[in-house]
């Protein structure tokens, strides 16, 4: 599947501190693993039944920061993202709206691509739909059955295949939740703890046997379709190997999705960890209320841009808070971001900055971003520069160019 056009990202001179990110599994901020070749990064993509809201955007803008920082530091990045284009929520939305589920998925994927292009997000090298990865999933399910990490229901009308969550002793290391919390999230987030015939209530679906009216693919274990978690396991490991550097997504994916994606890959490939870093972004609320489809209070990127709000301001509004924190989107957040953008542009156009001052500023911004993406501190450093810049004096064009290049290369904001 094709992604979207890559934005022009300028080369940024100068040295960069090593990037350090919080790892959910180890509960610590630690250096990102930089292999001799490329940094492998996998970020879970959308289920295409609704257009890109700010919760989605905040996640992909966070990992765009990581992508940009690593590239500006001279590292290659192999970025992979999936699209869950076969899943129950997609079918349910299509049935509700009286449309074909594939047509709905295609339309929402197209809108997502458009939003990502507008926001100047660097596209993944591999942008893979679940339907494109069926053979990979079948291969991994077969491997899990072979090693004893999975089983097929016997004597059931629908002989689904499940992963035995007790197979690996490290299960639970990624999320660090206790058994009770895992059981609650499993039930709330797409699990089926009461399914008859399972060995354990928390065993996760790997292959769903065909039901009337659902799409199906042939497999050695009967016609059906993939479970949710194993799609990401197969797509990630088949392109990045295991372990790879960064597994990312929203904090709501911490469990069960990322825990099971990891355990499937680890059991199939005989490794202790699927990823060195598990990085999760906070949730975005609207005016103090959690943003959700059920509440009808989603803020869509496409509607903001259609109303005339500049994508660069949307980026700055998202970056005003720390990526790991749950935070609010309000009209004031957007207005402040637009004011910030205008003040930076004014400082570049009319202010005076020496080359040494510019390089010190860029180093400061890089240092804040290297410290677990401390965007608030990075933006404040730029605010201080803009406020302190004397207007009306003859500026150093090289200094202005260096600041402008850094803001574009690191933050994706074109001044």
From Swiss-Prot:
Zn(2+) binds at residues 44, 232, 257. Its cofactor is Zn(2+). SUPFAM superfamilies: Nucleotidylyl transferase. A motif ('KMSKS' region) lies at residues 290-294. Binds 1 zinc ion per subunit. GO terms for molecular function: ATP binding; cysteine-glucosaminylinositol ligase activity; cysteine-tRNA ligase activity; zinc ion binding. A motif ('ERGGDP' region) lies at residues 188-193. GO terms for cellular component: cytosol. L-cysteinyl-5'-AMP binds at residues 44-47, 59, 82-84, 228, 250-252, 284. Its EC number is 6.3.1.13. One of its GO terms (biological process) is cysteinyl-tRNA aminoacylation. InterPro entries: Cys-tRNA/MSH_ligase (IPR024909), Mycothiol_ligase_MshC (IPR017812), Rossmann-like_a/b/a_fold (IPR014729), tRNA-synt_1_cat_dom (IPR032678). It catalyses: 1D-myo-inositol 2-amino-2-deoxy-alpha-D-glucopyranoside + L-cysteine + ATP = 1D-myo-inositol 2-(L-cysteinylamino)-2-deoxy-alpha-D-glucopyranoside + AMP + diphosphate + H(+). Pfam families: tRNA-synt_1e. A motif ('HIGH' region) lies at residues 46-56. Keywords: ATP-binding, Ligase, Metal-binding, Nucleotide-binding, Zinc. Catalyzes the ATP-dependent condensation of GlcN-Ins and L-cysteine to form L-Cys-GlcN-Ins. HAMAP family: MshC (MF_01697). PANTHER family: CYSTEINE--TRNA LIGASE, CYTOPLASMIC, CYSTEINYL-TRNA SYNTHETASE. Belongs to the class-I aminoacyl-tRNA synthetase family. MshC subfamily. Monomer. This is L-cysteine:1D-myo-inositol 2-amino-2-deoxy-alpha-D-glucopyranoside ligase 2. It comes from Corynebacterium jeikeium (strain K411).
């Amino acid at each position: 599947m094709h992604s979207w056009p890559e934005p022009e990202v300028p080369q940024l001179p100068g040295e960069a501190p090593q990037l350090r990110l919080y790892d959910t599994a180890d509960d610590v901020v630690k250096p990102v693993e930089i292999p001799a070749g490329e940094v492998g990064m996998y970020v879970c993509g959308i289920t295409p039944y609704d257009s890109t809201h700010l919760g989605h955007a905040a996640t992909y803008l966070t990992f765009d920061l990581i992508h940009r920082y690593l590239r500006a530091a001279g590292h290659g990045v192999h970025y992979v993202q999936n699209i869950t284009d076969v899943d129950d929520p997609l079918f349910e939305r299509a049935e509700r709206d009286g449309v074909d589920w594939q047509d709905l998925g295609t339309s929402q994927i197209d809108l997502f691509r458009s939003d990502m292009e507008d926001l100047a997000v660097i596209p993944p090298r591999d942008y893979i739909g679940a339907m494109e990865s069926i053979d990979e999933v079948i291969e991994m399910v077969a491997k899990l059955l072979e090693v004893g990490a999975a089983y097929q229901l016997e004597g059931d009308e629908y002989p689904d295949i499940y992963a035995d969550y007790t197979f690996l002793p490290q299960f639970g290391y990624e999320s660090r939740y206790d058994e009770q919390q895992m059981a609650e999230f499993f039930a709330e987030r797409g699990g089926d703890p009461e399914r008859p015939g399972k060995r354990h209530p928390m065993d996760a679906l790997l292959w769903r046997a065909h039901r009337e009216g659902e799409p199906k693919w042939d497999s050695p274990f009967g016609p059906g379709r993939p479970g949710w978690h194993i799609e990401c396991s197969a797509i990630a490991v088949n392109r990045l190997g295991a372990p790879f550097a960064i597994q990312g997504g929203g904090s709501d994916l911490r469990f069960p999705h990322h825990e099971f994606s990891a355990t499937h890959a680890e059991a199939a490939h005989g490794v202790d960890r699927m990823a060195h870093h598990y990085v999760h972004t906070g949730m975005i609320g609207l005016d103090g209320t959690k943003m959700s489809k059920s509440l009808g209070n989603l803020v869509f990127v496409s509607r903001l841009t259609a109303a005339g709000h500049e994508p660069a301001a949307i980026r700055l509004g998202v970056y005003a808070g720390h990526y790991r924190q749950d935070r609010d989107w309000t009209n004031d957040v957007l207005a402040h971001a637009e004011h910030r953008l205008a003040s930076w542009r004014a400082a570049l156009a009319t202010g005076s900055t020496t080359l040494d001052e510019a390089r010190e500023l860029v180093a400061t911004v890089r240092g804040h971003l290297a410290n677990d993406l401390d965007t608030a501190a990075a933006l404040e450093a730029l605010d201080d520069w803009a406020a302190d810049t004397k207007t009306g004096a003859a500026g150093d064009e090289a200094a202005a160019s260096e600041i402008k290049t850094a803001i574009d290369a690191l933050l994706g904001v074109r001044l």
